[in-house]
């Protein structure tokens, strides 16, 4: 449910001319969500909405009236806890708008930056998009490239290769 709500807010922000200002301000607030005290203040029903607004305003040196109105809207609808999802969805929509996609390469060993760049260049050509890859270590002997936003997944494992070789050899015999 929160993802649907976050998607609507992010879509509205993405259509604005000052999307980058909103995004930067939301990132500031999003970074505060790791603090338990901050979350307690945001989620508390005992703290008045005006005090919450003052508290959130204290995070910013330069006041943006549009962003303040957005925060008031979130406060009035008790949706401040949706800020992390809004930021995540906004990042996704910004990347889609700018034709930038983030993917993950799962491998048993850490890949060098050179290998990651080489994979990025090849995927950039294939999808005609700007692909950024991150490497995550997995326990499998396989290598897997996942581009969730594009619905693309490529997997290569030694077991699968051995099985295909065995099948091929058995067909020949």
Curated annotation (Swiss-Prot):
Keyword Acyltransferase part of the UniProt annotation: no
InterPro entries recorded: ATP_synth_OSCP/delta_N_sf, ATPase_OSCP/dsu
Entry's localization field: Cell inner membrane
GO MF term (any one): proton-transporting ATP synthase activity, rotational mechanism
Keywords of this entry: ATP synthesis, Cell inner membrane, Cell membrane, CF(1), Hydrogen ion transport, Ion transport, Membrane, Transport
GO cellular component: plasma membrane; proton-transporting ATP synthase complex
Highest rank taxon of the organism: Bacteria
Membrane-related topology note: Peripheral membrane protein
Family that this chain belongs to: Belongs to the ATPase delta chain family.
Function noted in UniProt: F(1)F(0) ATP synthase produces ATP from ADP in the presence of a proton or sodium gradient. F-type ATPases consist of two structural domains, F(1) containing the extramembraneous catalytic core and F(0) containing the membrane proton channel, linked together by a central stalk and a peripheral stalk. During catalysis, ATP synthesis in the catalytic domain of F(1) is coupled via a rotary mechanism of the central stalk subunits to proton translocation. This protein is part of the stalk that links CF(0) to CF(1). It either transmits conformational changes from CF(0) to CF(1) or is implicated in proton conduction.
Assembly and oligomerization: F-type ATPases have 2 components, F(1) - the catalytic core - and F(0) - the membrane proton channel. F(1) has five subunits: alpha(3), beta(3), gamma(1), delta(1), epsilon(1). F(0) has three main subunits: a(1), b(2) and c(10-14). The alpha and beta chains form an alternating ring which encloses part of the gamma chain. F(1) is attached to F(0) by a central stalk formed by the gamma and epsilon chains, while a peripheral stalk is formed by the delta and b chains.
Protein name: ATP synthase subunit delta
Originating organism: Campylobacter jejuni subsp. jejuni serotype O:2 (strain ATCC 700819 / NCTC 11168)
